[in-house]
């Protein structure tokens, strides 16, 4: 029963709220006396008061909502008006922009027509002429810049190259001895020559047959000569003959025994020389066959220069230059040390020693850059790597410096003498000095005989005669010095 009463009360309150909303929305309801209002059936006094309070609260909430809606509607109306004004303003600006663009196009066209009438050129022709002018100017500026860069690069390259080569030469100092292609064996007396020849020449024939070396016995006192194109065979024969002379027993069987022992001794010396060379250069891990061939070069000479010493010197020079250029020196030194390895077999295999050496290095597992440095050091193959170029440079420095080879030293001295002879033959020349290893010729002339103009003529004539008569690397600078001195004494 209480639940039913509560439900009826809620329904009554809801109906009352709806009625109040309708009255507020559509008009005021006629005033009703409090006495005319009947309480819902079954609703007590307290319940009616509570319902009345709820109705008042609902009415207040509705009024607040209506006020907020009205304020929002007012704001929306104001925003709409503002947007409409902005749209009208944008339309006016667009219209003004269109007029300005049209005026600008008209002015540009009038300017173009005026320029064409003034210059006598169409717009396309003027544009092409301007582009050509700018292009030519840019090319000229670029050419000047390139020329300046090339000049600076050339000067820097020459300076750096001279510095590198000079540093390498200064840091490498090696002794060179000019060796002959003929070995001399000294004898305790001339009677030993007869024992070497033997009865009916059997000893000398056996010696030459076993060793492959020509034994020359002439009128030279207490000495015999050994001649052979193979320096290793000649060295073996020299050691064998010295042992035979010391022993005193000389006959074909003894010659054969001593030759075999001498051959083993020379092979040990070659092996030791090769190992010393590798140790001096700082190279390891080389194939034993290459080491053996390298040792054979201990007894080979080229223009009087020992080949093994030349290889060690070349390796040091190449290593120093590689270090200056921040390149791995080990690879460069390896190629430089082996660049003449083909000379150990050049008479046994057809081909040049550079190509033979390259094939040997390739066969025994050397790096391809090392192989290329060997085959390209005489330009039989075009150098493609910096290692090959450094090997060429080091080889030229080692073999080309004065004193390294007899033939180059003789030609060097002859060239200097000829330079001085050419300059001394001119009238009025007092002194001549060949300086800087023959790269500069300084000529002192008599000031009373030669004037300034004649000095220039003499310098030009000497230079032309040198070009005609001499062959020389690089260039030779001819400087004619004419000096006049006047002196007085104050008493």
Curated annotation (Swiss-Prot):
An example Gene Ontology CC term for this record: plasma membrane
Group of enzyme by EC: hydrolase
Its EC number(s): 3.1.-.-
Membrane topology label: Single-pass membrane protein
GO annotation terms (biological process): mRNA catabolic process
CDD domains: HDc, KH-I_RNaseY
GO molecular function: RNA binding; RNA endonuclease activity
Membrane-crossing segments per the record: 4-24
Localization annotation: Cell membrane
Start and end residues of each HD domain: 307-400
Membership in a protein family: Belongs to the RNase Y family.
Protein name as it appears in the record: Ribonuclease Y
Gene: rny
